[in-house]
From Swiss-Prot:
Domain bZIP: 104-148
Family statement: Belongs to the bZIP family.
SUPFAM superfamilies (UniProt xref): Leucine zipper domain (SSF57959)
Molecular-function GO terms, alphabetical: DNA-binding transcription factor activity; sequence-specific DNA binding
Protein's recorded name: Transcription factor TGAL6
Renumbered residue ranges of the record's region Leucine-zipper: 132-146
Entry keywords, A to Z: DNA-binding, Nucleus, Plant defense, Transcription, Transcription regulation
PANTHER family per the UniProt record, alphabetical: TRANSCRIPTION FACTOR TGA4 (PTHR45693:SF36), TRANSCRIPTION FACTOR TGA9 (PTHR45693)
GO cellular component terms given for this protein: nucleus
Disulfide bridges in this chain: none
Region span, Basic motif: 106-126
Length: 397
């Protein structure tokens, strides 16, 4: 085909050929068109000028294509980054909240160390208490063995056929257990007495009356525990309770059936309860009279029991057979079991007296009464200590 002159300079024909061509021009298949295709022109964007009469306008520079592809690639990465920002922010916020809700590792380690130290402290305290109780048991056992050795020395001129004279058998475990419990009870009573004294010195207010009420109830509960311990120990060794070996010498001097006389306590502590109303005076007087009557009845019962046991021992003929002798001794042993009931009834009288005084008196009066009672027993123990520490003549062992 013959081309007319200037055909190659006819830019319009070149443009027509490029438009009508079935395949896109070479510059349209470059890598830049793959990224330029999604680009859309905004409604208010000014279209780029296109020169139609200069072939330079259709000439694509490789550098420009590369830069355009780089720009489009950066824009797509930027859009992808924008889409990822909310999720990252949410995840970071969620992680921050979770971290804030969790204590730091240093705090957790410190808490674990504190728990371990507290556990070891409790174990040491428990071991110390067990060691203390064991030592107290050994001390009580040595004291009882010493007392029985003294009794054996007193009766050393007795029959050689009775080497155990002065001994009543092995030490009862129940008595030793009561010795430890009673020592703890004394500590608790001293603490309650001190708290009552401090509370009474602070004056009278609504809060103070409530505190006094709680202290009075705690003091009464402490005495109730003592009576329960004594009943349990009496079933194991009633003579241990009745003899007062668990008390100081001065307390044993005033002992009545293993404890204090309720009527004597009421008489000695009544001045500490003043002022009393007329009704309270009548009720306290009636309670004291009733206590004296029950005490007399129990004392008479004890005297009768002693006489009955003595009669059982003297009823046996020295020339009777061993079988007849054992029958009389068995009767005497059975009668001794009644001593447990006497101890229980005496403690019941003491308990009822304290409860009736609590009912008759006001909270403040009951607090003063328990304070006076605790101080009363403390002075007995202090008197025994002073007596034991008194100066002795060097010529007397």
């Amino acid at each position: 085909m013959e081309l007319y002159p200037g055909y190659l300079e006819d830019h319009f024909n070149i443009h027509k050929l490029s438009i009508s061509s079935a395949s896109p021009p070479e510059y349209m298949t470059s890598a830049s068109t793959q990224f330029a295709a999604p680009v859309r022109m905004g409604a208010y964007d000014r279209p780029p000028p296109v020169g139609m009469w200069s072939h330079e306008q259709f000439k694509v520079d490789n550098g420009q294509a590369t830069s355009a592809s780089t720009i489009m690639e950066a824009e797509m990465k930027f859009e992808n980054r924008l889409e990822e920002i909310p999720q990252v922010v949410l995840e970071e916020g969620r992680n921050v909240d979770q971290e804030a809700s969790k204590p730091p590792d240093k705090v957790l380690r410190r808490l674990a160390q504190n728990r371990e130290a507290a556990r070891k402290s409790r174990l040491r305290k428990k071991a110390y208490i067990q060691q203390l109780e064991t030592s107290r048991l050994k001390l009580a056992q040595l004291e009882q063995e010493l007392q029985r050795a003294r009794q054996q020395a007193v009766y050393a001129n007795g029959s050689l056929r009775e080497p155990n004279l002065g001994f009543t058998g092995p030490i009862d475990p129940g008595a030793l257990g009561f010795e430890i419990k009673y020592s703890h009870w004394v500590d608790e009573q001293n603490r309650n007495t001190g708290e009552l004294r401090n509370a009474l010195l602070q004056g009278q207010t609504t809060d103070q009356d409530l505190e006094l009420k709680l202290l009075v109830e705690a003091g009464l509960d402490n005495y109730n525990r003592l009576f329960e311990m004594k009943e349990e120990a009496a079933n194991s060794d009633v003579f241990y309770i009745m003899s007062g070996m668990w008390k100081t010498p001065t307390e044993r001097f005033f002992l009545w059936i293993g404890g204090f006389r309720p009527s004597e306590v009421l008489k000695n502590l009544r001045p500490q309860l003043e002022p009393l109303t007329d009704k309270q005076v009548v009720e306290v007087g009636g309670l004291q009279q009733t206590s004296m009557q029950v005490e007399d009845a129990l004392s008479q019962g004890m005297d009768k029991l002693k006489q009955t046991i003595a009669d059982s021992l003297t009823a046996a003929d020295p020339f009777d057979s061993p079988e007849a002798y054992m029958v009389h001794m068995a009767n005497a042993v059975e009668q001794l079991r009644s001593l447990v009931q006497f101890v229980t009834q005496a403690d019941h009288l003491r308990q009822q007296t304290l409860q009736e005084m609590h009912r008759i008196l006001t909270t403040r009066q009951a607090a003063r009464g328990l304070l006076a009672l605790g101080d009363y027993f403390q002075r007995f123990r202090a008197l025994s200590s002073l007596w034991a520490a008194r100066p002795r003549d060097s010529g007397i062992s």
